[in-house]
């Protein structure tokens, strides 16, 4: 248990991975049964089968499912916009990832770029089923896929979800010269040009 009363991820999962994201064909392994990637990964049947993936969560409105019979598909029809209600899907997607894992399968969660929507859903899953706080879940996913950057609206929904699960939040929204961002972005935002999706 951490000092916040949450368990931490198992030590075997906490060790840095020596496999680069490029070696995984554009996907990152988040846990033994959860992968995160961009949309093009979902079209690579050989890669999916090689990783033991049995379920594909498609968190886009713009990419159709391939509907190959050997995979189960879950569609989360959302745009990568701050007002999109991704929080409505946190429990459903987390429960599905957990169910697939218990059946010894693996899940790929993808969006178009593997940066915002899919990362948000993976973070929510870690909070719910690995009992880690939002900050730990974000740092864990970012260590596995450094390009992740959930949009501000998704952060607000993750903060609300953490409060619902644990009664407090470990990430706060703060004012910066570029607008309101989660405090985990504050340091890096000092070096960024303005970007609408911060």
Swiss-Prot record:
Name the UniProt record assigns to this protein: Dual specificity protein phosphatase 14
CDD domains according to UniProt: DUSP14
Record's keyword annotation contains Cell membrane: no
Gene it is expressed from: DUSP14
Keywords of this entry: Hydrolase, Protein phosphatase
Listed InterPro entries: Atypical_DUSP_subfamB, Dual-sp_phosphatase_cat-dom, Dual_spec_Phospatases, Prot-tyrosine_phosphatase-like, Tyr_Pase_AS, Tyr_Pase_dom, TYR_PHOSPHATASE_DUAL_dom
Assembly, per entry: Interacts with CD28.
Hydrolase is among the record's keywords: yes
Organism per entry: Bos taurus (Bovine)
């Amino acid at each position: 248990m951490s000092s916040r009363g949450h368990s931490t991820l198992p030590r075997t999962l906490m060790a840095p991975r020596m496999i680069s994201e490029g070696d995984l064909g554009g996907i990152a392994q988040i846990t033994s049964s959860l992968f995160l990637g961009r949309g093009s990964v979902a079209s690579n049947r050989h890669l999916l089968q090689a990783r033991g993936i049995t379920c594909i969560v498609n968190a886009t409105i713009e990419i159709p499912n391939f509907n190959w019979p050997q995979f189960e598909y879950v569609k989360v029809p959302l745009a990568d916009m701050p007002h999109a209600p991704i929080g409505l899907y946190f429990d459903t997607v987390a429960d599905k990832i957990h169910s697939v894992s218990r059946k010894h399968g693996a899940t790929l969660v993808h969006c178009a770029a593997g940066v915002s929507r899919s990362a948000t859903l993976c973070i929510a899953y870690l909070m719910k089923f690995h009992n880690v706080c939002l900050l730990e879940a974000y740092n864990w996913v970012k260590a596995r896929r450094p390009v992740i950057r959930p949009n501000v609206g998704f952060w607000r929904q993750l903060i609300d979800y953490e409060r619902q699960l644990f009664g407090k939040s470990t990430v706060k929204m703060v004012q910066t010269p570029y607008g309101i961002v989660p405090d985990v972005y504050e340091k890096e935002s000092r070096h960024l040009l303005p970007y609408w999706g911060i």
